[in-house]
């Protein structure tokens, strides 16, 4: 049993090393691609090419490139013999690292100026078949596949666990702290600290309207029953009691915003604490989301994109933004200004749509052209 536990611990440590090497290499490859796209027009980086930027900026770019390509090569050397343990998403990340390393390999750079090169002794596809057979006939192939399955299973369980923690811990902290700590403390010190129950004009207007309706209801009930309308003294007494009740209700509502703000701050602190103590799990969660997203078909990706854009920047999105802004204003105790809401609806969805189209043009069109083509077809060719 002790030997099995030691082997499990060693396997988990090895899995973490593989994930760390893959993440470092993948981030370095993405950095190189971003440098190519930003400074070299989506072409390979050439140290001998003079850019139309200051020399200090070009030196920084080349320094980042050299550091990133060295990280990619080191990661590729370490991951070369771990292919069987990688899931499809990790294999795609490894292929990206390989493509970047091959693009800047010395052999490729040296042979770039030539028009043709000597043919390989054997076709690459035939070599790939031999390599596949070699891996399948390897005595450790079954153990490698089982280790890869266990690692993917552990990755899924860790991702679900940290996702539940990120959702439930801040929510529970917010509700429990607001109910048992913040609300009693604010109610206790609100009479002595005026800023905890600052006056709100909209609450006063609502109280006046409720008092006017209450007076009309008294007179209407008296007329329905056939009784005489209450005298001025009786009406004044009832209105005074109702006004006191409305005042207490307004005072209670005026502290809700302060309670909500403090409870939200406590939830934010809890969220940050969970993130700080779950950094390794968050990296696993990011890989899980990447695998889920990239594992979708092109039609599913296009459908999700169209659904997202129609909800937030589509024809019916102004109604949703209005409800959302009203809820946020009520949560924090701000008056719902119609002019601000209309200005927000007229500008923010447009900015969001522009950012989204730019993302499609710069990133999605290069990473998944088939998804862009499917998106255009489902969107009516636009």
From Swiss-Prot:
Encoding gene (name): pxcA
Annotated InterPro entries: CemA (IPR004282)
HAMAP family (UniProt xref): CemA_PxcA
Segments passing through the bilayer: 156-176, 257-277, 305-325, 340-360
Protein family membership: Belongs to the CemA family.
Bilayer topology: Multi-pass membrane protein
Protein name: Proton extrusion protein PxcA
Any single Gene Ontology cellular-component annotation: plasma membrane
Subcellular location as annotated: Cell inner membrane
Role summary: Required for H(+) efflux immediately after light irradiation to form a rapid H(+) concentration gradient across the thylakoid membranes. Together with PxcL, contributes to transient H(+) uptake following dark to light transition.
Keyword annotations: Cell inner membrane, Cell membrane, Hydrogen ion transport, Ion transport, Membrane, Transmembrane, Transmembrane helix, Transport
Organism encoding this protein: Synechococcus sp. (strain WH7803)
NCBIfam families, alphabetized: PRK02507.1-4
Chief place of localization: membrane
GO molecular function, one term: proton transmembrane transporter activity
